[in-house]
């Protein structure tokens, strides 16, 4: 398999160029001319090794899940795969959408995000996702869980374990984490699923901040990309966006 095999049959590649910025991948634009003479463009992301393969698969499945629910909100994913002549090199391919550098219109953006959360349905009725997704190059906890409290707690535990693995043990972190898991999370989240209350597992982008959103140049339609999805409480990733904007 090669990326060129996933392009429209009979098309001619007219140009390729680097496009976009990524900490983890090479990213580019592919321009082609279709058999009828119509120009068309594609975006490609290339990563290496086993982690790169897992990340390209995760992005394809994430973007496909969002596109299936709300196709106008994301560039159409096309394929992911491994290069035939470079077995350790992997790609994610989607349609190319020219975007402005401005933030999307907040009212249009919020309306689309709300629609995504409301229309999406977890295939298992649980919180999680069917394939491990990655926030940057870090794997997220996505195992299926019946309870939002349980899912969130295990997600936080995995994040803390990764922190300890990278930076070493911390007595202060141990003290804080015990309070977090024994008191804070149960007190804040358990009432959401008590006395008949329920939390709907909604499809969330997973890494929603200003650098992963834009507006289509032609339609001014808000778009999001670089998704690392899972089914969660619909507000769970808003704190990530606020933190990113605050420290930008």
Regions found by a protein language model. Name each.
Residues 2-7, 82-85, 121-205, 216-219:
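An alpha-helical support segment within catalytic cores of ATP-dependent transferases
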Residues 9-18:
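Conserved N-terminal boundary motif of the eukaryotic protein kinase catalytic domain
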Residues 17-150, 154:
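ATP-binding pocket architecture of kinase catalytic cores
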Residues 41, 91, 201-203, 222:
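Hydrophobic "anchor" residues on beta-strands that sit immediately upstream
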Residues 99, 222, 228-230:
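Activation segment
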Residues 162, 229-248:
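Active-site activation/catalytic loop segments of kinase-like enzymes and analogous catalytic loops
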Residues 208:
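Hydrophobic HxD+1 residue recognition
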């Amino acid at each position: 398999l090669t990326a060129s095999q996933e392009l429209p049959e009979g098309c001619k590649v007219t140009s390729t160029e680097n496009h976009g910025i990524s900490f983890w991948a090479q990213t580019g634009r592919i321009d082609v001319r279709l058999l009828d003479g119509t120009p068309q463009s594609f975006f490609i992301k290339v990563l290496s090794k086993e982690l790169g393969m897992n990340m390209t698969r995760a992005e394809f499945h994430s973007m496909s899940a969002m596109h299936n629910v709300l196709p106008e909100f994301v560039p159409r994913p096309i394929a992911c795969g491994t290069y035939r002549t470079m077995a350790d090199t992997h790609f994610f391919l989607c349609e190319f959408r020219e975007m402005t550098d401005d933030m999307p219109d907040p009212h249009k953006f919020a309306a689309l995000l709300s629609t995504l959360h409301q229309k999406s349905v977890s295939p298992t009725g649980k919180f999680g996702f069917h394939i491990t997704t990655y926030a940057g190059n870090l794997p997220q906890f996505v195992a299926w869980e019946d309870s939002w409290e349980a899912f969130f707690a295990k997600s936080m535990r995995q994040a803390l374990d990764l922190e300890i693995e990278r930076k070493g043990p911390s007595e202060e972190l141990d003290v804080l984490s015990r309070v977090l898991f024994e008191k804070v999370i149960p007190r804040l989240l358990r009432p959401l699923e008590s006395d008949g209350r329920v939390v709907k597992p909604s499809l969330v982008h997973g890494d929603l901040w200003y650098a992963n959103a834009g507006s289509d140049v032609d339609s001014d339609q808000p778009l999001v990309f670089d998704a690392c999805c899972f089914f969660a409480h619909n507000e769970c990733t808003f704190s990530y966006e606020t933190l990113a904007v605050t420290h930008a």
